[in-house]
Amino acid sequence: MDTAKLFVAGLLGGVINFFLGWLVWGILLMDYFSSHTTNPQVARSSENMVFWALIGGNLVFGFLHAYILYKANVKTPASGAILAATISALVTLGSNLMMYAQYDLLQLSIVLPDVLASALVSAIVGATIGWYYGRGPLNKTV
């Protein structure tokens, strides 16, 4: 296992996941999710956000993507996007349905947009990691 390549891919995936998550859930879908949550007061305000945990969680997802794509021998952006989006959609759908069943936090109308948003973000993360894994040596001569 090329741990250096896996480490760089994990960092790359985590950083991209963080910024895309901020854009998608923190800006684009924030109002929709707030209006379809059963208790919006449980969400932390920007001032009370625990950023070390947010950054850590995004890095974990970046390394998870990097590890799965490494083990699947992904070497192209397209194959990385497809595999990452598929896994993300399934994990998000499963976890959202279990949360809906057990907690009074969200309405069912949140599930599909969240699954689609997660798949989109993961597709971009997976495409980037697939590109990184498939690129040739940097010192190639012509």
Over which residues does each language-model region extend?
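Juxtamembrane/disordered regions of integral membrane proteins
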Residues: 1-142
